[in-house]
Amino acid sequence: ISSRVEGCAIKWPNDIVIDGRKVCGILTEMSTQIDYINHVTIGVGINVNLTEFPEEIRETATSLRLECGHVVKRAPLIAAVMKRFEQNYTVFLEHGDLSGLKERYSELLVNKDREVRILGAKEQYNAYALGINQTGELIVRKEDGTFPFSGGTGRSTDCLLYTSDA
């Protein structure tokens, strides 16, 4: 999407936004053992040709059709998404982590160099988002140092919010 739409960015960890409005969400589920991945399930939802949204998300959501100004054909879009996924997955397998992708990810990271509000299961704090590390954790800087934040438990209480428009 970022190669075709100006203003496209990643909102860590799993949203694609265009000028701050969500156009795509990605959900993952993984089953692992100590040193083995049993399976990974990935779900991608893209707002393709919607022209209206429910009132509660109208200000925060968009679609490719609204951003591009024309109807977007789904088949070529899905083919392009799958091709890019395959390319990125190949890089991931070569490195065994996200180190081969983190520079591009950080370039597209809308959270980078912004003050964010971390709402964790055990603590809440403001920090500055610096980028991601090789495991995909968001690197944040607080007064007492620099730390990775994973949002790790998958609970809805673990999240990150913007606090300023840097």
Stretches with model-predicted labels:
Residues 125-131:
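Short beta-strand-centered aromatic/proline hotspots
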Residues 138-142:
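SH3/SH3-like beta-barrel fold
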Residues 162-166:
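Conserved small/polar residues in nucleotide/adenosyl-binding loops
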Residues 108-118:
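Short coil-to-beta transition motif at edge beta-strands of beta-rich domains
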Residues 1-38, 60-62, 66-79, 83-94:
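Contiguous, small/hydrophobic- and glycine-enriched helical/loop subdomains that border
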Residues 50-57:
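Cytochrome P450 core scaffold surrounding the K-helix E-X-X-R motif
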Residues 146-155:
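A short macromolecule-binding patch
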Residues 90-104:
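Mixed-charge, Lys/Arg-rich low-complexity intrinsically disordered regions
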